[in-house]
Amino acid sequence: MKYLIVGLGNIGPEYHETRHNIGFMVLDALARANNLSFTDGRYGFTTTLSVKGRQMILLKPSTFMNLSGNAVRYWMQKENIPLENVLIIVDDLALPFGTLRLKSKGSDAGHNGLKHIATILGTQNYARLRFGIGNDFPRGGQIDFVLGHFTDEDWKTMDERLETAGEIAKSFCLAGIDITMNQFNKK
């Protein structure tokens, strides 16, 4: 069985390890932990992680964030992956740094990547893992904040949070969304 695990982010070295690129960071950590490397393909960088007979196609879209839906649709069609086997990993301003929340569906919460995915897929009924990046910015400073780098305090727990996010993605594929939400959302 195949799953598409999409980490949202922006391409380019200027966005490397910025808050808005936490989706890329989760997939990079998951690939690194399994000695995998990404290859450049159409609409994104991919690698495949096999876990207990399940194929997890990890996708870092090469489109800009607000065009992420194009990459998601392309890889779903190319690999014949149903919507219920898709997980989007995204940054979330509404959650404190490091908080992880798996949801089976929901609004885009003002996130342009999720907004475009919903527009292209014609539904908001897809799983998403929200990775809290906090919201410690002055009024009007949202863009600078999400495109900014993590604090030294954030980095103290980053590896553990990235590892947990990877475990959530694997559990999504192995145990399903309901069991995974019950297991991880309370932490």
From Swiss-Prot:
Query: Would you say which domain of life the source belongs to?
Result: Bacteria
- Which Gene3D superfamilies would you find in this protein's record? Peptidyl-tRNA hydrolase
Q: Where is the active site?
A: H20 (proton acceptor)
> EC no.?
3.1.1.29
- List the GO biological process terms: protein quality control for misfolded or incompletely synthesized proteins; rescue of stalled ribosome
Molecular function in Gene Ontology:
peptidyl-tRNA hydrolase activity; tRNA binding
Instruction: Outline what the protein does.
Output: Hydrolyzes ribosome-free peptidyl-tRNAs (with 1 or more amino acids incorporated), which drop off the ribosome during protein synthesis, or as a result of ribosome stalling. Catalyzes the release of premature peptidyl moieties from peptidyl-tRNA molecules trapped in stalled 50S ribosomal subunits, and thus maintains levels of free tRNAs and 50S ribosomes.
Which family is it part of?
Belongs to the PTH family.
- Could you identify this protein by its name? Peptidyl-tRNA hydrolase
Which species does the entry assign this protein to? Bacteroides fragilis (strain ATCC 25285 / DSM 2151 / CCUG 4856 / JCM 11019 / LMG 10263 / NCTC 9343 / Onslow / VPI 2553 / EN-2)
